[in-house]
Amino acid sequence: MFAGSLRAQSNPSVSFTLDFPGSQPEHYTIRVAADGKATYESRGPLNSTSEATDDFHINFEASPPTRERIFALTDKAHRFSGDLESHRKNLASTGNKTLTYDDGSKPVSASFNYSNQVPVQELTRLFQDMSSTLEFARRLNFYYRYQKLALDAELKRMEELAKGNGLAELQAAEPILRQIADDPSVINVVRARAKGLTERIAR
């Protein structure tokens, strides 16, 4: 009870940052606070054919199960106070990752390429799946405004990832999904895909 009360007062946060030049996006940070307030910032080209590097920012509300899982895994990882890197040789680089726990006094961060600690692996996968959802939202917003013919292929990819449990916090993309689903100027198959994805959002 005391720990929960202290957490509620300080509203700590957990952040995940990835820096991976040449990937899409090449940089992003997700921050989730104990009260559920979350932010996502990324930088990189919109897609594989885009040459321009753009910044993207979105605020969203993390679902209670996700934020509880994030803080539970953070506690299991000792709030990142130790060395998270596996130090295994001959591992391909998958980007520099940094996890940060900030309780309002002194942030604690640890960086790694690959960790063999299960809580860290699970946090990494969860944050990467959240980034996938938010990057879909980014592209869908752009295509809806400027390139509606690209919506079908993008939503099909999104469906496939959702079916394979490769997306997290789908509700963060709900505004644009509902906008597409409710727009009679969009072809029916695209509207149906968007509607189907909104139906996957946990209530």
Language-model segments: what does each one mean?
Residues P64-R88:
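Charged, amphipathic alpha-helical segments
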Residues T17-S42:
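N-terminal targeting signals for Sec/Tat export/insertion, comprising classic cleavable signal peptides
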Residues Y40-I58, R157-E160, E174-R178:
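Acidic/histidine-rich, surface-exposed loop or edge segments in extracytoplasmic proteins
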Residues S13-L18, S42-R43, N59, D75, ...:
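Mature extracytoplasmic or organellar-lumen-exposed domains after removal of signal/transit peptides
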Residues G4-G22, D83-R203:
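Short, well-ordered, aromatic-rich surface patches in folded extracellular/luminal domains
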Residues D35, E61-R69, Y101-P107:
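A short, structured loop/turn motif at beta-sheet edges
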Residues A38-A52, Q128-L140:
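A short, surface-exposed interaction/processing loop segment used at functional sites
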Residues F56-E61, A110-F112:
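A short, exposed loop/beta-hairpin motif centered on an aromatic-Gly-Thr core
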